[in-house]
Amino acid sequence: MKRIRQPIIAVLGHVDHGKTTLLDRIRRTNVAGKEAGGITQHIGATEVPIETVKNLAGPLIKLWKGEIKLPGLLFIDTPGHEAFTSLRARGGSLADLAVLVVDINEGFQPQTIESIEILRKNRTPFIVAANKIDRIKGWKIEKDEPFLVNIKKQDQRAQQELETKLWELIGKFYEMGFQANRFDRVQNFTRELAIVPISAKYGIGVPELLVLIAGLSQKYLEEKLKIEVEGPARGTILEVREEIGLGTTIDVIIYDGTLHKDDTIVVGGKDKAIVTKIRALLKPKPLDEIRDPRFRFDQVDEVTAAAGVKIAAPGLEEALAGSPVIAARSEEEVEKAKQEILSQIQSVVISTGKVGVIVKADTLGSLEALSKELQEKNIPIRKADVGNISKTDVMEALSVKDEDPKYGVVLGFNVKVNEDAEEVAKARGVPIFTGNIIYKLIEDYEAWVKGEEEKKKRELLSKVTFPGVIRLYPDERYVFRRSHPAIVGIEVVEGRIRPGVTLIKQNGQKVGVIKSIKNRNDFVQEAKKGEAVAIAIEGAIVGRHIHPGETLYVDLSKNDVIILAKQLKNELDETDIKALKMTAKVKAQQDPFWKAV
């Protein structure tokens, strides 16, 4: 028997833009008030029955032609995008739909952009809640009022300010490749993003938001939401946690089938599939929050998707957040589920032994997302695993550092660095990058690589000798001093010269070292093709070693040529290459190596 399940809704957005406050308003509980700094600390799930939506939405429900058949909405209260990234189902996102909360006064922030990128990559449809309209100067507040009613009560100036802020948001979405508009102006919901102006604090606009979520889910996701009620359950672990009297439990979102209290389940572990039998199924009543510590769980016989459920069972200590849960009713199903889970873990948790970065993340889903981003940017991975950054990770990065310094690093998403790991990293110079925004984490790493390459280039440039060919002026007037040191006027014919380089004659004989270069009245550190300068040559005597009108060459070592060809190729311009070829011709008289240059 098939029926439509509740859509699973994720709430994303930047810190303090109002994600938890919005869910509170829908739930009429006050979770945000209990959280440290008003920020959601844990992952939770809340079931909102369709009756509650209808009561909140009132006459607005009639905006949708035909009856809404959904049993309700299942909200995941995520700490921003990290949890969304972690929560996967069969390679895609667990969420059917998302609400992106944006503070209309602050606009786009780093985690807003990260959230949009994640939603785009997962192809998850979303609605925008433009929050905190109550902070617009002079905004008249009526609690829980539909936005379309509330806007009519505002004066012209407040309405105009809202309009300006909305257009700023619409412009930002356009820059990211999305057509967006205020929800009541949207012509086609498949092509345009709907923006609902709301005040999560006072409930303004929340009725429209709920109607849109329910209506869009019904209209566009109906086929996806059809489940086989009697089929074996599938879900994703939100969190693994200790509960007094129950031991290690897992909070799970069931998105398919029905889970029974005596079912055998297969769960994703650190490097294995865990097979265990359910001891108790604990389900909160609608409108109560899984993660509320004051809540006493009800034991239930079965749970049908979509639902948030706590499972108590033996052997869950090594279960991984973000990994799959599959119910199995026969030995054959157990084996099949084990293979499926193992292949999923093995595709994400990797150890190649090749030169590449070390990647650590808090859950399987976030590890998969981070690895994917790195692969798209052609950054090789040596090891990708779940868990905090350990001393072993640092030592492995150290071995890579010896082969290729730019990959001898550890990247950690939403994880801590163990104390001993930090000590070794500092002592041995292994960079550790951590953060909770994937693109920012990769950006920081790329900026470091760029900085290191620039530093290396500067070091090489200071050590390497560039090719240069000069000609002494034929007129004796340009011989300013004959010796100790010889000072002569020259023209740079090809390439460049710097103080400290040795000069050689046409026959390869060394004549002296350039001590200084003077351009008119100033001493300079470099002279390039076409420049006329005076140079002081230590060790040369005019008339004995060098003569007016003579061509001289900057002496190069084989090492100079190798560095220039391999590491500083982009620093050589056309005239440098000409100078190199001319010098190679001179040096080839004594060493066949130079014939190949």
From Swiss-Prot:
It comes from the Archaea. Function in general translation initiation by promoting the binding of the formylmethionine-tRNA to ribosomes. Seems to function along with eIF-2. GO terms for molecular function: GTP binding; GTPase activity; translation initiation factor activity. Residues 38-42 are annotated as: G2. GTP binds at residues 13-20, 77-81, 131-134. InterPro entries: EFTu-like_2 (IPR004161), EFTU-type (IPR029459), P-loop_NTPase (IPR027417), Small_GTP-bd (IPR005225), T_Tr_GTP-bd_dom (IPR000795), TF_aIF-2_arc (IPR004544), TIF_IF2 (IPR015760), TIF_IF2_dom3 (IPR023115). This is Probable translation initiation factor IF-2. Pfam families: GTP_EFTU (PF00009), GTP_EFTU_D2 (PF03144), GTP_EFTU_D4 (PF14578), IF-2 (PF11987).
